[in-house]
Amino acid sequence: MTQPKSRVKIVSAETLSNGWTKLSSYLLDYIDRKGATQRLKREVYHRTPAACILLYDPRRDLVILVRQFRLAVHMNGDPAWMIEVPAGLLDDDHPEQAIRREAMEETGYHLRDARFLFKCYPSPGAITEVVHFFVSVIDIADRVAEGGGLDEEHEDIEVLEVPLDEAAQMIENGEIFDAKTIMLLQWALLNRNKLR
């Protein structure tokens, strides 16, 4: 099903903050489904694109996950040390180059392949970030470094080896509550036989 391209005209834009992310306020006109022009004011966070990857070891039927501190989660009162798939910002790299770099930095695994699965907007109502999702079949021999993140980026990342079925249970019991991680684990559960 194809969607008509939005008919939008930006009337004005104002930068509200320009730190790690940029926050802008927009006044816009758009033509709705009935053909009427609507004037709206919206704020948008301009966020660098990112990539994430599920590292799956079919011989041991496990996934490589990471645990790291997330301030935004802490601010909401949830456990701040989140269990996630390896991920990172593109930093002007192609998504596959970026995720290969991030997998090595965070987990110490050298990827023989990185298969692109899909891309999505995790919060399209207010954030421009697009995330590219990948999967890679790995083996214990592919771990060529310790991982754990980069000292100069003050990363403190724990590398976890989790059986896939246990990871599914961790979603059910609330231990894993990161959206990109849940999406990739559910994809792996649906496609496990194709990965073996």
Regions found by a protein language model. Give the residues of each.
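Short loop segments at secondary-structure junctions
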Residues: 31-32, 57-60, 69, 137-141, ...
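Beta-rich strand-turn-strand
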Residues: 92-97, 106, 110-112
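Acidic/glycine-rich phosphate/pyrophosphate-binding loops and surrounding catalytic core
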Residues: 110, 115, 121-123
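Conserved Nudix-box catalytic region and its N-terminal flanking loop in Nudix hydrolases
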Residues: 42-45, 54, 62-101, 143, ...
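Active-site-adjacent beta-strand/loop module that shapes the phosphate/pyrophosphate-binding cleft
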Residues: 27-34, 123-145
